[in-house]
């Protein structure tokens, strides 16, 4: 199983990088997981202009990566418990998760996804959402493997 997590962020260095690497390492016995950070001059310029331009730049950056079962993270997406989230992994061998940039994700991009989910009704920093997503991916894989991590 291949799982890719795509995020738009300025740099790889953040306060949760070590924790994310640890979840990737722990998940390796279940799946090949990659953390794909996307940021370029076009995104930087578009974000400084405004929301519409930024969303268009995010679309252009993400669309070539729409492979396998695509899951978008959005505050208005469906909320799942950990067992429901784990079911996503049962029938899909290639999954791609997408975390929006400062302006979220466009309707156009969300419409191309097989699933749109929310991690919480609360608003949280993107780096926290990303850490929670990696933990839930590990938890979901453990649930499906009957691993004791999820009790």
Curated annotation (Swiss-Prot):
Signal peptide: none
GO terms assigned for molecular function: rRNA (pseudouridine-N3-)-methyltransferase activity
Subcellular location: Cytoplasm
Catalytic activity, reaction form: pseudouridine(1915) in 23S rRNA + S-adenosyl-L-methionine = N(3)-methylpseudouridine(1915) in 23S rRNA + S-adenosyl-L-homocysteine + H(+)
SUPFAM superfamilies, per the entry: alpha/beta knot
GO CC annotations, alphabetized: cytoplasm
EC number of the protein: 2.1.1.177
Broadest EC class assigned to this enzyme: transferase
CDD domains documented for this protein: RlmH-like
Record keywords: Cytoplasm, Methyltransferase, rRNA processing, S-adenosyl-L-methionine, Transferase
Sequence positions that bind S-adenosyl-L-methionine: 73, 100, 119-124
Known function: Specifically methylates the pseudouridine at position 1915 (m3Psi1915) in 23S rRNA.
Assembly notes: Homodimer.
Family affiliation: Belongs to the RNA methyltransferase RlmH family.
Protein name: Ribosomal RNA large subunit methyltransferase H
Protein's gene: rlmH
